[in-house]
Amino acid sequence: MKRTYQPSKLVRKRRHGFRARLATVGGRKVLAARRARGRKRLSA
């Protein structure tokens, strides 16, 4: 069986990137929550 994590910078950016987060209401909530917590990095 192959490993489930096959790293790809492009897919990572598209799925978990800042622009992807801003594109949906849920993603915006994620960013707001991470800002409220004082996270150094908001997204991938």
From Swiss-Prot:
GO terms for cellular component: ribonucleoprotein complex; ribosome. Keywords: Ribonucleoprotein, Ribosomal protein. One of its GO terms (biological process) is translation. One of its GO terms (molecular function) is structural constituent of ribosome. PANTHER family: LARGE RIBOSOMAL SUBUNIT PROTEIN BL34M (PTHR14503:SF4), MITOCHONDRIAL RIBOSOMAL PROTEIN 34 FAMILY MEMBER (PTHR14503). NCBIfam families: rpmH_bact. Belongs to the bacterial ribosomal protein bL34 family. This is Large ribosomal subunit protein bL34. The gene is rpmH.
